[in-house]
């Protein structure tokens, strides 16, 4: 199930970022960034995919809205990752 991420998802986001993206990130930094970025919904979109059985985030996408002179509003994907245990199942 797709849903907005919350501060309670920080542990899963940290783990996915570490193991699937290769970023050795600190849990406190992940929490700080979730707080900051989820409060900026005019520029940042962060959606998680929740495992319906465990209610844990098993994948996420972070995108940023942007404007340019030559087209309407665009969307840059800054991060997209799925827990390797769930890859190949159409999640990402």
Where is each model-derived feature located?
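Acetyl-CoA-dependent GNAT
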Residues: 4-73, 78
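Residue-level recognition of the GNAT/N-acetyltransferase active site
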Residues: 83
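Conserved acetyl-CoA pyrophosphate-binding loop and the N-cap/start of the following alpha-helix
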Residues: 86, 90-91
């Amino acid at each position: 199930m797709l849903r907005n991420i919350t501060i309670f998802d920080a542990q899963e986001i940290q783990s996915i970022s570490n193991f699937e993206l290769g970023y050795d990130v600190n849990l406190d930094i992940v929490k700080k960034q979730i707080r900051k970025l989820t409060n900026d919904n005019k520029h940042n979109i962060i959606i998680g995919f929740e495992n319906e059985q465990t209610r844990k985030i098993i994948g996420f996408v972070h995108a940023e809205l942007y404007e340019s002179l030559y087209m309407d509003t665009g969307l840059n994907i800054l991060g997209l990752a799925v827990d390797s245990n769930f890859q190949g199942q159409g999640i990402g």
